[in-house]
Design a protein with these regions (language model features):
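Hydrophobic alpha-helical segments embedded in the membrane of multi-pass proteins
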Residues: 77-81, 98-106, 125-138, 153-161
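Structural signature of hydrophobic alpha-helical transmembrane segments
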Residues: 66-76, 119-131
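Loop-to-transmembrane alpha-helix initiation sites
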Residues: 2-6, 122-131, 152-154, 170-183
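Long hydrophobic alpha-helical segments that form multi-pass transmembrane helix bundles
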Residues: 1-80
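Membrane-helix interface "capping/anchor" motifs
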Residues: 1-3, 87-99, 142-153
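Conserved mixed alpha/beta catalytic, RNA-binding, or beta-rich assembly cores of soluble enzyme
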Residues: 76, 87-117
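Hydrophobic alpha-helical transmembrane segments in multi-pass integral membrane proteins
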Residues: 20, 24-25, 111-116, 121, ...
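Alpha-helical transmembrane segments and their membrane-interface exit regions
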Residues: 13-15, 103-109, 131-137, 180-190
């Protein structure tokens, strides 16, 4: 595959209906499945960070995924367990997502997007956005990724830099999607 099909589909939906893609039901609400939707929606931590505000969600809730955002991308404990499982099975190389997330963490520590501590900035950038999900399941997958070890290392670093750049200057909340599609193109040139 030249592009990750899931990312391509999500990109299409994001570009066509961004107001619907990034509207999340408030935590612990029961949105209607059929008929008119009356559930209250709220913004994700990624949006709060993108406008330079401090997230009001505490760090424990962030780690447990008890905050609005894309379904399946926010429970940090589950995602970390998945990463370790995939690495133990040999499906991914553990160092690939760790390098990408390390680049994001370093930039978040030195250049936080809002007025809070370096540690909180790193934490929210990694666990409050879809970065952890994207680096584990999409950037590390072997089909659209680089094939040589040197290429994987370079790809992980470049992905981290692009993710930081998009998170700080991009137009949409979830920069990992755009970074993934760019890396799909770049990886073919890295090898």
């Amino acid at each position: 595959n030249l592009f990750n099909p899931a990312a391509g589909g999500l990109l299409f939906v994001t570009l066509c209906w961004p107001q619907l893609v990034f509207a999340y039901p408030a935590t612990f609400t029961n949105p209607e499945v059929f008929g008119e939707v009356t559930a209250r929606t709220t913004n994700s931590i990624a949006y709060v960070l993108s406008v330079g505000s401090v997230p009001s969600t505490d760090m424990t809730s962030v780690m447990l995924g008890l905050h609005p955002g894309p379904m399946g991308t926010l429970n940090g404990l589950v995602l970390l367990a998945c990463m370790l499982y995939l690495a133990a099975r040999g499906s991914i190389r553990l160092w690939q997502p760790l390098i990408t997330l390390g680049v994001v963490a370093v930039f978040a520590a030195f250049f936080p997007r809002a007025a809070y501590s370096s540690l909180a900035s790193m934490y929210y950038e990694i666990f409050g956005t879809a970065a952890l999900f994207g680096t584990i399941f999409m950037l590390s997958e072997p089909v659209t990724g680089a094939t040589r070890e040197e290429g994987r290392l370079l790809s992980s670093i470049v992905a981290g830099l692009l993710l930081v750049g998009y998170n700080y200057f991009g137009a949409y909340q979830q920069g990992i999607l755009f970074v993934l599609l760019l890396m799909n193109i770049i990886n073919h040139h890295i090898d």
